[in-house]
């Protein structure tokens, strides 16, 4: 893992801007708990979170499932996000709602579909955590993972402080102490994330009260930058729903998914234009 200098990121702007919902597709009931979104070979990939089948689903750009891939040998304890690089897909099995889990991991799978695939596990823990008793306001839950340079970066969902701590991991299998490299004062709890290396653009989804969800956009994001970041906040105009995944297309275009909130609704795939 590359040596990373500690930095603290401070929120210096939280202006709420307008945006437009350009496309809105209903997803199959199979994807009621969709919790990650990436693009591989011109298809979306997504997965369900806690307790569902250990499967990656491939969708077209209207949300229709066209393929699925079972991740044999692994359970879906709480798969919360996806990240990709040129060779691999990374599945974030790191949901930890009440700070009780001791089996956090990132599952590493090849991008290319092959019946002889072998999957690897990047197991980790937070060295700052010593108390694994049930906590309603958890500090070591996490739902956002990005691939950046030769590293994986975790954004925690700190309910107690309404911040996001940043932890870095290598991309190689093994057992690790995740290294804290900073904190992002989101003033909300982070539920998903994506990073575009060509644009140096970071996008996070977050919520304050679970009734409203937001996109947090940070430009010129880098592991080596120590300056304060300006965070632009955009309310997602879709009403009461649960948003846990985002994919950057360009500086102004994003796709998100939302979970099914009731028996009369369905999960959704949406395109948003700033």
Question: For each of these PLM feature ranges, what is it?
Answer:
Residues 19-274:
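Sequence/structural signature of beta-propeller domains
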